[in-house]
UniProtKB/Swiss-Prot annotation:
Residues 9-19, 113-125 have a biased composition (Basic residues). This is Small ribosomal subunit protein uS12. The keyword Ribonucleoprotein applies. Pfam families: Ribosom_S12_S23. One of its GO terms (molecular function) is rRNA binding. SUPFAM superfamilies: Nucleic acid-binding proteins.
């Protein structure tokens, strides 16, 4: 354990925390172009076909991004907006595509949590 005078001479160094979303480079979102759109299976014990896009970002990074919601219109060369947020049962997927911005359409017939899926308010009957 150091003495007070040792700490005065050389203070303690704060631990630097590693970013969970390094490709965003401290930005809230980044734009990119889809290089591949595919489905993949989650880790045990879950079972599904999760929709994922491989995206080349404007800063040169290439990342995997999850496409949330039911149905999507993305294909190769689609321009998408990426935000942080991992998918727990898909290893290596640390980003989400933002629905309802750029080339990504919002989810059709969405009634609840619409802002997360880029859906407009339905007309009341």
């Amino acid at each position: 354990m150091p003495t007070i005078s040792q700490l005065v001479r050389k203070p303690r160094k704060a631990k630097r925390t590693k970013s969970k979303v390094p490709a965003l480079e401290s930005c809230p979102q980044k734009r990119g172009v889809c290089t591949r759109v595919y489905t993949t299976t989650p880790k045990k014990p879950n079972s599904a076909l999760r929709k994922v896009a491989r995206v080349r970002l404007t800063n040169g990074y290439e990342v995997s991004s999850y496409i949330g919601g039911e149905g999507h219109n993305l294909q190769e060369h689609s321009v998408v907006l990426i935000r942080g947020g991992r998918v727990k049962d898909l290893p290596g997927v640390r980003y989400h595509t933002v629905r309802g911005s750029l080339d990504t359409a919002g989810v059709k017939d969405r009634k609840q949590a619409r802002s997360k899926y880029g859906s407009k308010r339905p007309k009341s009957a």
